[in-house]
Amino acid sequence: KTNTSYYFGTTKLSENYPQIAAFNAVITQELLIHKLSITDECIENLCVNKTKINVNQGFTRCSLIALPNNHFITSDKGIAAVLEKIHASVLYVDSFDIILPAQKHGLIGGCMAFFDGILWIIGSLHAFKEGEKILQFLKKINLPFIELYNGPLWDGGSLFFLQ
């Protein structure tokens, strides 16, 4: 047993877009970032007091990792442009060499998670062509990170931590 709260959404999931992406939002203390036209009603209701940021990418969480103090890393140029307009600190990286089985490549949000003040990474930034950019960004914002294995970045869809 955990003390983790959970909610049931109203969107009937399927393998088809946009239903498959209805829950793929990024939520911070202040923001809800998603393609708002497809966001599940439950998420909208839970985020009623947050600033809503609309992006064209339905797979927002797959493409974006939110870090403290309005810092973000994304593999989507459209998301980067929208966040820069609200004066967020955004690092864009190309996801061409992130592994996602059965797909051409993965996305940056799928191989990272932020929990308990630490950025957790599925793989090693040294094995990622744009890893040095991320290392410099993390150093600039003084953010610790843990690489979970010494190999290429692997898009596992994210990581979940239960307390």
Model-identified regions with their sequence ranges:
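The feature marks the mature, well-folded catalytic cores of soluble enzymes
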Residues: K1-Q163
